Structure formats: structure tokens, C-alpha cells
Amino acid sequence: MVAEESGPGAQNSPYQLRRKTLLPKRTACPTKNSMEGASTSTTENFGHRAKRARVSGKSQDLSAAPAEQYLQEKLPDEVVLKIFSYLLEQDLCRAACVCKRFSELANDPILWKRLYMEVFEYTRPMMHPEPGKFYQINPEEYEHPNPWKESFQQLYKGAHVKPGFAEHFYSNPARYKGRENMLYYDTIEDALGGVQEAHFDGLIFVHSGIYTDEWIYIESPITMIGAAPGKVADKVIIENTRDSTFVFMEGSEDAYVGYMTIRFNPDDKSAQHHNAHHCLEITVNCSPIIDHCIIRSTCTVGSAVCVSGQGACPTIKHCNISDCENVGLYITDHAQGIYEDNEISNNALAGIWVKNHGNPIIRRNHIHHGRDVGVFTFDHGMGYFESCNIHRNRIAGFEVKAYANPTVVRCEIHHGQTGGIYVHEKGRGQFIENKIYANNFAGVWITSNSDPTIRGNSIFNGNQGGVYIFGDGRGLIEGNDIYGNALAGIQIRTNSCPIVRHNKIHDGQHGGIYVHEKGQGVIEENEVYSNTLAGVWVTTGSTPVLRRNRIHSGKQVGVYFYDNGHGVLEDNDIYNHMYSGVQIRTGSNPKIRRNKIWGGQNGGILVYNSGLGCIEDNEIFDNAMAGVWIKTDSNPTLRRNKIHDGRDGGICIFNGGRGLLEENDIFRNAQAGVLISTNSHPVLRKNRIFDGFAAGIEITNHATATLEGNQIFNNRFGGLFLASGVNVTMKDNKIMNNQDAIEKAVSRGQCLYKISSYTSYPMHDFYRCHTCNTTDRNAICVNCIKKCHQGHDVEFIRHDRFFCDCGAGTLSNPCTLAGEPTHDTDTLYDSAPPIESNTLQHN
């Protein structure tokens, strides 16, 4: 007959209904009187145990069995389990020492789970392997076969705060015999009093319920932990309406509080005396552990957690400090501590304040959706912040002010409703290897005499700029990757003077580095590339030093000086820009030294609109247009530059341009080494102009020049060409050994288009043919006049730079000296003007 079960283990039991076979002898161990002794009992995983065979009266002679006297051998496992279900923990441990079978059954996890939940209420085992360490586990994933029993052992000697249960417990001593090590109290204050009177060792379990207005001042190393089913901290709520909910005082060095909700909920939420009241108050010379707590304060005048004073050094971990009506966590007055893996969100003021030499270590906290700043360090506050996720705060993610000096490492600071990091009023700090992105304002903002270190960060995809340094700001900006920002990657203004080095500033929707309003700074060894506007702007009285940078592949200008922008540009590589490598305009007067400027789709250096500048010892080559353009009343100084292998001219001076050109080497350029036009008047001294593929120097369109001590040699078209009406001042020039291809072509009767094609402009006598109805924009070389237009009504135009339209095939009659027409030259009449930057349109 099958026994009917009603006790624990009746459902889904691993033990099948069966009787034991008779054994010749049994194994037993001495009975222990405590849980410590029970820990040595033999335990096995019974879920996979082989099923015992039923005992048949026909197959065994029961009267002859040597173990007949042991009735328990004949009981089914389920019956034994039913009996064991009425035992308490110490009796179970004693039963486990009787024999191997009892050891197996008395260690049944279901028995221990029932006992465990009856005492501690946890629906998952709470492990306590060492002082100050508690954590819950999933039983199925734990390596020990009976985690319920193991946790019971670890938590056994403790006091329980369980309102209403103490009277029942002490009124039924027989029912709870063996639980003398457990104490029960109705209030937390009573339990703390029991610790002071040494009734127990200081482990307090606070069971489910709301505990209001208790006086919880902790002056000893007690351990207080919530005990409840499900999510423990939601079920154990301790609140105060008049005073700080928990106060840790000297003597509580190793105290532990965990797995509960701690609230400060005053009736008058704005009363001024509450500014000294908090959910948690941790004072001098104590280092408690606060673990897995939910912390809430509705008070508008005091922080939720306040850690203050020398020697205050708590560990606060896995806590949720949210929805508070003031500051979440406040660390001040030389306090320290370790704060790890906390959730800090939706607080009315800063998520964290650090002030007055507070110096915490804050790791892996999630600080978000604050109604103010995320982290605020000020008044000499410090701290080490590592691997925190700081985002979606209403003001900056991280603010540093008034001599504060935090270290922020490998954090993510993003999606701020204003900026990412804000350092002001003499703030300092080290910001290292962080990701700063998608903030509405600047990723990093440094102002008002602040001097932080910004190293190794990724600053990207901001809705404004990357790093802004304003208002006498300083700082070291080093080794950062700054990209994809809507405005300038770095902006320096109003007397600020940072050091900017080893950064990559690229792919911005605006410019790379913008220095304006008397900005300064040392900008060296950066790579600035692929920005939509200028790689570097310098304007409005600014004087930065740019040294050893690589500025390249921009969609406009490389470096742009305008509106009295000054400074030093030296030892840089500036290349492959869609516009000029360098532009100087409107009173700007930089010193440009020892740079390599090449590969531009426009000119190398463009000086225009009254620009100045001292341009010395540069190498300017392989630009699509002139190596240097000087225009519109500009007056730079060029010394000792090498300007070569340009796809247009070497130096072009137009529209009233002036300048001093001294000791430059100008060679191997496709057009004239120096072209001077349209009322310009430069001074050229001691230059060498040679090996050009066109003329050495050409002067035209009412321009003049002073030429002293120049050497002009081995140029293809010739050395010096002066258009009609041009007068120059010349002294001690050497014009020698030029190839004179123009004169040779004329003397051989060739059309000059033969040597120029439509890409060059040889200077010689040019004419117009009235018979062929040529326009004012057509010109015919002297040999075509003699041969192709012989007998026509012709008119001498002037000695100047043209190419022959007859030889180009653009006239009605074919040229008899040249080949087939190759190109329409009506619109190709002079060197193409450089493209001027439209950067200002985007300011």
C-alpha cells in the first residue's frame, strides 16, 4: 500500500516511495549539539540516486535478518522526510549523524529551504562567507549541493527584529527549543541595545515591515541586514521624519547595513534645521559598509547621504540613491570612502557633491537623469572616478569648480542636456581615457583660470564643439581623439592659453581648431584632418603657437588667419586641402616658418585683403595653383622659402599687392616663377628663380617692382619679361642662361601657341586682326600676323602675356603654322584666381 504524503517533499520529491533493503550493519557518527557540528555531516546530491528495490517477503526471510530490530530501515524515505519536517535545525543535524541514510535525508534541500524561509524569509539563499560580505545566489547555479543549509549555518547566530513575533517566540520555548542562539526584538532600537549589553555578537536581521522614527545611532561594529522574500530592499523600509535615519559614529568602523530601504521623509520638507539631517550620516573615524540599499530623501535642504569628517571612510556599494529632493551623495571635510556599482539618478541637485578636500574613490556608478549636474566637485574637492556612466543630466555631466582637483578615468559622459565636463573658477582635475559624446553643448568646457589635464579621451558627436577653452582658461589637452562634432573640435578664446598636443581632430562638421578673441596657446604635434571648414582658424587678436602639426585633407583651408589673427606657425605639414594651405587676410600678421605646404587643390599660401605675415624658410610645392598669392594691398615678407614644382606659378602678386621677397629659391614651376600684375609693387632681393617651365619673372598690367641682386636662370621661356608700359627699378640682377624658347620660336617663324598650348601665357608682341573680326579678348602672335594674316587689317595691341588664338584654332580662319584646334581659349586668359575661404559665412 502506498503511503499518502502531506509534509514537505510530498510534491516533486526526489525520493520515491520505497522500503529499504535490510543491511547487515549501519554507519553512525556522534551527535553534535550545534550547527557547527552539523557542518561535518555527510551530504550527497540525491537527485540522481539509483532507486532502491522494494523488499519482498517472498525473497527474504525477515525473521532471519540481523537488522530486524531497526524499524527505520523498513520505513519509506517519504515517511522519514515527513517526520524530519517537524524537526528544527539542530535536531536535523543530530539526525544526520545517525546513519548514512538519515544523513542523506536530513540534508534534503527542500527540508532546509522550508526551515530557512521560516527563519530568514529569503526566497534565495543569502551567503555570508566573511564579515561585511553578503550576496544572494540562485540555488540551481550554486556549486554546493545544499546552499540553504550552508547559508543557515553562516547566518545562524543573529538577532531578529520582527515586530509581534518576539512574544510568540519566548512564549513557546518548547516549540523553539534549540534556538537559544536566536534573539527576537520588536524594534531596531531594542536590538541595538542588546548589542551594547553583549547579548549577541551584533548580527541583526530586520524583517519585512516599515520602521518609523527609530533612534538609530550606530557606535559599534554591528551588522544589520534586511530579511524578506523577493527583492529584499523593497520589503524592509526604515524611515525617519524628524532626524537622520541612520547615524554612524566613531566606533562603527566595521559596521554593515544592507538590503533595505532607508528614507528620510520629514513633514516640513524645507525646514532649515533639516539641512543637517540625512538618510545616512557618516561621521568622523568610521568606515561602515552600506550595501544593496535603496536610499530616498524628500527633504529639500539636505543631502540623502552625507559623509563628512577626517577618517570617515565608508564603503557604499550596489545602492540606489535616486529621486531625492536635494543632493544624492555628499562627501566633504576630508572624508574618503569607496563607492562602487551604485545607481544615482533623478536627484533635484547634483547626483554627487565632493567638497572641502573630500577624496572618495568612486567606481562603476551609474549617474543619470539628474535634475542638475551629475557630479559636482568644488572648494578643493577631489576624488578618483573610474568607469562611471554619467548621462542625461540637466546641466553638465561633471562640473569642477574652485580649486577642485578630481581624477576621472575611463568614464562615459554623454547625452548631457548642456555640456559634458565643465571646469571653471580655477578648477583643475585629470580627465583620462573617457568617452565624452553626444552632449548638447561642448564636450569639455574650460574657463575662468582653470587648468585641467584632458588626456587620451574620445570626444565626439557633440551637438556643439569638442573642447572649449574660454575666459583665461588653461589646461593640457593631450592625446585625445576629437571628431564628428557640430562646431569646432577645439575652440580657444578670450586670453586662454592651453597646451594642445598629440590630438587627432578630424571629420568635424565645422573647423578643427578655432582661436579667437585674443586666444593664445601652444598647439603642437596634432593631426588635424578632414574637417568641413578650416583646419585651424586664428582671428581677432589671437596669438597661438602652432608647431609640428599635421594639418591635411580639409574641405577648405588648412590654416586661416583673418581679422588681425597673429601667432606662430612653424614646422608643420600642411597638405591636400581643397582651398589654400594657408590664408592670411585683413590685418593678420603671423610668423610662418619652416612648414611644408603641398598638395593643395588651390594655392599654397594666399595673402589678401591687407594681409601681412613673415613667411620664412618654408617649403611650398606641388600645389595646383600658385605657391604664394599676394593680393589686394597685402604686404607680407617672404624669406628663404623654397617654392617649387607647382602646377601653376611660383609667386603671383596681383591687385595692388606688395611684399618683400628675399633670398627665396623659386624653381621648377609650371608657370612664371614670379608674376606681378595689376598695380602691384613688390620688392625682390637676392632671390634665385630658375628651372621654370615658363618665364622667370613677368611684370604686367601697370605693375612695377624693385628687383635687386636676383639670379634668374635656366627658365624655359626666358628670364625677365616686362609688358608695355611697365617700369621697374633694377640693380645687380643676374639674368643668364635661360632657354629663351619664345625668342627662338619667333626667330624660327613658329606660332607661339606651339610652345605655350592653352596652359601658358608667353609674353611677346601681340596683335588684333580687324579683317578676321577678332574680339578684344583675342590676340595673335607676330608670326601668325606675318603668315596667316598677311595683307589683313591688323593692329598692334601690346607686348604682354597672351597666347595665340590663331594657333589655338578659335578664329574663323585656320592657322597655317599650328596644328588642329585643341581648346576654346576665350575663357582662359589669365592665371585662375585663388579661391578665398568662405569660412566667415559659417561663424
From Swiss-Prot:
The organism's place on the tree of life at top rank: Eukaryota
F-box domain mapped to chain residues: 69-115
SUPFAM superfamilies attached to this UniProt entry: F-box domain, Pectin lyase-like
Gene Ontology terms, MF aspect: protein-arginine N-methyltransferase activity; ubiquitin-like ligase-substrate adaptor activity; ubiquitin-protein transferase activity; zinc ion binding
GO term, biological process aspect, one: proteasome-mediated ubiquitin-dependent protein catabolic process
CDD domains the UniProt entry points to: F-box_FBXO11, UBR-box_UBR6_FBXO11
Keywords, comma-separated and alphabetical: Chromosome, Metal-binding, Nucleus, Repeat, Ubl conjugation pathway, Zinc, Zinc-finger
UniProt keyword Metal-binding, yes or no: yes
Cellular component aspect of the GO annotation: chromosome; cytoplasm; nucleus
Annotated metabolic or biological route of this protein: Protein modification; protein ubiquitination
Repeat region (PbH1), residues: 311-333, 334-356, 357-379, 380-402, 403-425, 426-448, 449-471, 472-494, 495-517, 518-540, 541-563, 564-586, 587-609, 610-632, 633-655, 656-678, 679-701, 702-724, 725-746
Subcellular location field: Nucleus; Chromosome
Zinc finger intervals, UBR-type: 749-820
PROSITE patterns (alphabetical): FBOX, ZF_UBR
Oxidoreductase in keyword set: no
Subunit and interaction comment: Component of the SCF(FBXO11) complex consisting of CUL1, RBX1, SKP1 and FBXO11. Interacts with CIITA.
Function: Substrate recognition component of a SCF (SKP1-CUL1-F-box protein) E3 ubiquitin-protein ligase complex which mediates the ubiquitination and subsequent proteasomal degradation of target proteins, such as DTL/CDT2, BCL6, SNAI1 and PRDM1/BLIMP1. The SCF(FBXO11) complex mediates ubiquitination and degradation of BCL6, thereby playing a role in the germinal center B-cells terminal differentiation toward memory B-cells and plasma cells.
Record's protein name: F-box only protein 11
Native species: Rattus norvegicus (Rat)
Lineage: Eukaryota, Metazoa, Chordata, Craniata, Vertebrata
Chain's gene name: Fbxo11
